[in-house]
Amino acid sequence: MAHKKAGGSTRNGRDSEGKRLGVKRFGGEKVLAGTIIVRQRGTKFHPGVNVGCGKDHTLFALSHGKVKFEVKGTKNRSFVSIETE
């Protein structure tokens, strides 16, 4: 004989995994060519000098140097550049 009544069903109880987006290398950090700087959805940060943009809008270093974040333009866009030494 059951000691508990049957539990009801629910339509909740699931969620997607986090996608690990965000800034991976911060301003002033030294990076090598190919290092991922930002993983993002859309272009929250735009590629500047010596920075490439992947098909999923990932920004990566095209040369060795220091990461530099700057806001410029009339639309106040954030750009990521690499200053070579």
UniProtKB/Swiss-Prot annotation:
Similarity comment: Belongs to the bacterial ribosomal protein bL27 family.
Source organism (scientific name): Hamiltonella defensa subsp. Acyrthosiphon pisum (strain 5AT)
Ribosomal protein found in the keyword field: yes
Record region (Disordered): 1-21
Family annotation (InterPro entries): Ribosomal_bL27, Ribosomal_bL27_CS
Protein encoded by which gene: rpmA
GO molecular-function terms, A-Z: structural constituent of ribosome
Descriptive protein name: Large ribosomal subunit protein bL27
GO cellular component, as recorded: cytosolic large ribosomal subunit
GO biological process entries: translation
Domain of life: Bacteria
Keywords: Ribonucleoprotein, Ribosomal protein
Family matches, as Pfam families: Ribosomal_L27
